[in-house]
Every structure is written in C-alpha cells, then in structure tokens.
Amino acid sequence: MYAWVCNSERGLSVLVTSTFYRAVQWVVFLVLTLVVALTISWALWAQVDFAYPWLHDHAGMAENIAYYGPRNAIRPAFEQTTTQERMRLFHGIVQAIQQHGVGLESMVYHDAQGKPINTLLTLPEIVHLQDVANLLDKLKQGALVALFGWVLMLVRLLQSRQVLPTPKQLLLGMTGLGVVVGLVLVLGAVQVFYQLHQWVFPAGHQWFFYYEQSLMSMMMQAPDLFGYIAVMLSVTALIISMGLLWLYQQLVSKR
C-alpha cells in the first residue's frame, strides 16, 4: 500500500511538472510569436509611413498645423507648406530614425512654390529623435534574438507534434491581454505614454514639446498620432499572430 502511494505521488508530481513545463513553453512561444508579429507589423506600416498621409487629412493634423503654424516663432510659416511637403518631411523622419538618425539635421521645409523656409528640427528635437533612433536599434537587436528563439521553439514544438492550446486557453490569454489594455485606458493612455518616455529616454533629454515651439510635435499632433500608430500596430500584429499560429497548426496536422 505504501509503495502504491509513493508511486502515485511520484506519478502525480511528474504529471504536474510536465503540465507546468508545457504551459510555460507555450506562454514563451506565444510571447515570442507576438514579438515577431509586432516586428513584421512595424516593417509593413513603415513602408507606408504609418498611414500619415491619410491621418494628416482625416485625423485633424492639417487643422492642427493651420492653427499652430502661425503661432510658432521659432520655425515660422510651416502652415504655408503643402500636404505633399509635410508627407515628404514625415517620410524623412521615419527613414532617419530607422537609419541611426542620419539626415535629421539637414531636413528643410519649403513653401508652396518650393522656396526653402527653414530647417525643420531644433537641436532638442534632433537629440530626441536620435534617442528614438538609438532605441529602435536596440529593439531591432532584441527582435532578432526573439526571432531566433521563436524559430528554435517552432522546430522543437513541431518535432514533438504538440498541438496548440485549446480555444478556451487562448481565450483566457486574450482576456488577460484585454485586462492590461483596459488598465491602460483606465489609467489614461496619455499618462502611460508620458511615463514610458520617462523610463525609456535618457534623463535630462527633452521629449515633451509644445506645438507652438515644435514643428515635429505640431505636424504629428503628438501624442495623438502615436495612439493611432499603436492601434494599427497592435491590430496588425494580432492578425499576423493568428496567421502564424494557424500555419503552425497546419504543419503539425500534416506530420
């Protein structure tokens, strides 16, 4: 009887350990899948400048420039630029932050006749965007590590022919994600945005700019633009994640 109890306890312990290990393995794989999906999502949206041309015309950014442009004494007459010029400038910023900050100092804005008016960015703005470029460089390195880990786990899971968690388990995971998003909304997206800046960027480096003093903030209507971008990246990443998991399930079913 004693031996049976000991064997049962050992068997239960092995089962619990195995179940816990599989659960942790799936959590890690799903997190890596999301990181890979976010990386792909960023790369895709960057190709179209994060929909800035559409947002400029439909999200109040053109009106923001028309109102605050005449009030900016540091970089005047930005309201005289055309929509195409603003798109060119935003594209230049997107390219620069993805290329180690190269070209930020030389960006110039022109009026409707093509006459140069002034350089776009002040020194504090250049420093901030250089910080953004440095951050992106680190995130790219992290994304490569995540991709490598994801591929290794994918191969391992395929070799062991492990099926995906049940829809109920995935739903619980999505519910957890929804709770996090809900907390962000309750606490205030703007407050969270500002707090992240304090954590991420070097102390003493300016990252908050008033519209009347910054063409960068004015043309982006910060932080509104970043909220739109966050939604686009998240939704696209979720769709890509679902596609990757569906592909995994298809590969497992054919083995």
Question: Model-found features: residue ranges?
Answer:
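Hydrophobic secretory-pathway targeting helix
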Residues: 2-52
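Juxtamembrane interface at the cytosolic side of transmembrane helices
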Residues: 16, 20, 146-193, 242-255
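Juxtamembrane non-transmembrane segments of integral membrane proteins
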Residues: 38, 43-90
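Hydrophobic alpha-helical transmembrane segments
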Residues: 77-89, 114-124, 169-187
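Individual transmembrane alpha-helix segments
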Residues: 91-145, 222-233
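Juxtamembrane non-transmembrane "cap" segments at the membrane-aqueous interface
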Residues: 187-211
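Terminal transmembrane helical module of multi-pass membrane proteins
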Residues: 204-255
